Regions:
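Sec-dependent N-terminal signal peptides
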Residues: 4-13
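A short, N-terminal "cap"/entry segment at the start of jelly-roll beta-barrel domains
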Residues: 13-73
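His/acidic/aromatic-lined binding-pocket segments of jelly-roll/cupin-type domains
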Residues: 70, 77-80, 116-117, 125
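Short, conserved beta-strand element in jelly-roll/cupin
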Residues: 73-93, 100-109
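Acidic, glycine-rich flexible loop segments
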Residues: 105-125
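Conserved metal-binding segment of the jelly-roll/cupin
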Residues: 118-138
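A short hydrophobic beta-strand segment most commonly corresponding to one strand
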Residues: 140-152
């Protein structure tokens, strides 16, 4: 009986995740990307915040059209492509841009982008804070990616 009670006391420890730990399998992320497609907004983008962890937060983004140009004053983006393909335009200036929320600047496009990086599944990129960037898609294409935003 004592052994049974001891085992029962250990049950809550099995599978318990430490604070701040989270795991997403490749199949979890692919399934999540399918749930985002029906939630597209007027800019043909949908996202789901997967967690806030103090200095960083994680989201999955699904796009079926080119995105706005964006720049984050205090956050770096680490992006991993889950599915689809596109091009990341990086650098340059964002004419006509506006601050949309604290530390977030958006605009219609980038002038003078210095990097045009093709993106496909498994690709990973890091974008420093205060760096203009924009996801570009060819008509009929879509892309889903995992983003880790890290406060600098």
């Amino acid at each position: 009986m004592k052994k049974l009670m001891g085992l029962l006391l250990l049950l809550p420890l099995v599978g318990a995740e430490p604070a701040g730990y989270k795991y997403w399998s490749a199949s979890d992320l692919k399934a999540l990307s399918k749930t985002l497609a029906p939630k597209l907004n007027a800019h043909k983008v949908a996202s789901d915040n997967l967690g806030d962890f103090g200095r960083d937060h994680v989201l999955v983004v699904h796009r079926e059209g080119s995105g706005e140009a964006e720049l984050h004053e205090t956050e770096a983006d680490v992006i991993m492509v889950i599915s689809g393909e596109g091009t990341m335009l990086v650098g340059g200036t964002m004419p006509g841009s506006k601050t949309t929320t604290a530390g977030e600047v958006r605009g219609p496009s980038i002038d003078g982008g210095t990097v045009r990086q093709k993106m496909s599944p498994g690709d990973i990129m890091h974008i420093q804070p205060k760096t203009a960037h924009q996801v570009l898609l060819e008509p009929g294409k879509q892309i889903t990616y995992f983003t880790l935003k890290v406060k600098e």
